[in-house]
């Protein structure tokens, strides 16, 4: 994956900020620090190949340490909203958002309480599909969901299909053999 040097520099600043804050608010597992670029940065950046237009509004739910939302903003997505219920993490996200040249809004609320619209909704290490869909019922996603998922993705799809109608594509993660990117659109509740 080719990344411009200016973006790499900003991502390095972001990495250093995470390392500094991680000591006090546990943003990422200490076990992932040695493999930070592959585990967190590239894992987030790989979503860019499924974002055809960077001039959109992207919402990242359960943003935590800013993956993938902050990374996608640094990579060029023009408007990103980060939804995070933990105030301490929101304070970190506000600091981290200054690294990007693009618009980042931090929303310190529970996801299910928010009514907003966007082109794309992302999340990483958040929850299963049913929970994601339930929590985001008040969010109007015009284009698609881009969800970074682990090895239980097929079970999640089968379970979600019992309550929801949706189209999906499964993409292989470039950072993890068992990881997948679920590209979901046309979501409607059936029960």
From Swiss-Prot:
The catalytic activity, as recorded, is: guanosine(527) in 16S rRNA + S-adenosyl-L-methionine = N(7)-methylguanosine(527) in 16S rRNA + S-adenosyl-L-homocysteine
Q: List keywords of the entry alphabetically.
A: Cytoplasm, Methyltransferase, rRNA processing, S-adenosyl-L-methionine, Transferase
Q: How would you classify this enzyme at the top EC level?
A: transferase
Name the InterPro entries for this protein: rRNA_ssu_MeTfrase_G (IPR003682), SAM-dependent_MTases_sf (IPR029063)
- Gene Ontology CC entries for this record: cytosol
* EC identifiers of the protein: 2.1.1.170
Q: Gene3D superfamilies, from UniProt?
A: Vaccinia Virus protein VP39
Q: Where in the cell is it found?
A: Cytoplasm
Q: Does the keyword rRNA processing apply?
A: yes
Residues binding S-adenosyl-L-methionine are 62, 67, 111-112, 124
Name any one GO molecular function: rRNA (guanine-N7-)-methyltransferase activity
| Function in brief | Specifically methylates the N7 position of guanine in position 527 of 16S rRNA.
The family note in this entry says: Belongs to the methyltransferase superfamily. RNA methyltransferase RsmG family.
PANTHER family membership: S-ADENOSYL-L-METHIONINE-DEPENDENT METHYLTRANSFERASES SUPERFAMILY PROTEIN (PTHR31760:SF0)
**Under what name is this protein listed?**
Ribosomal RNA small subunit methyltransferase G
User: Organism, per UniProt?
Assistant: Rickettsia prowazekii (strain Madrid E)
- What gene does the UniProt entry assign to this protein? rsmG
């Amino acid at each position: 994956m080719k990344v411009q040097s200016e973006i790499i520099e900003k991502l390095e600043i972001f990495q250093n900020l995470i390392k500094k804050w991680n000591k006090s608010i546990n943003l990422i597992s200490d076990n992932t620090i040695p493999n930070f670029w592959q585990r967190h940065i590239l894992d987030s950046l790989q979503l860019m190949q499924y974002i055809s237009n960077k001039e959109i509004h992207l919402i990242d739910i359960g943003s935590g340490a800013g993956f993938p939302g902050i990374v996608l903003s640094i990579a060029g997505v023009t408007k990103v909203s980060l939804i995070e219920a933990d105030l301490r993490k929101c304070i970190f996200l506000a600091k981290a958002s200054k690294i990007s040249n693009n618009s980042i809004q931090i929303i310190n609320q529970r996801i299910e309480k928010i009514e907003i619209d966007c082109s794309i909704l992302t999340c990483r290490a958040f929850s299963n599909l049913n929970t994601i869909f339930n929590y985001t019922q008040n969010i109007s996603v015009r284009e698609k969901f881009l969800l970074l998922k682990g090895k239980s993705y097929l079970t999640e799809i089968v379970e979600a299909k019992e309550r929801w109608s949706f189209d999906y594509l499964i993409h292989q993660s470039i950072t993890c053999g068992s990881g997948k990117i679920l590209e979901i659109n046309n979501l409607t509740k059936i029960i």
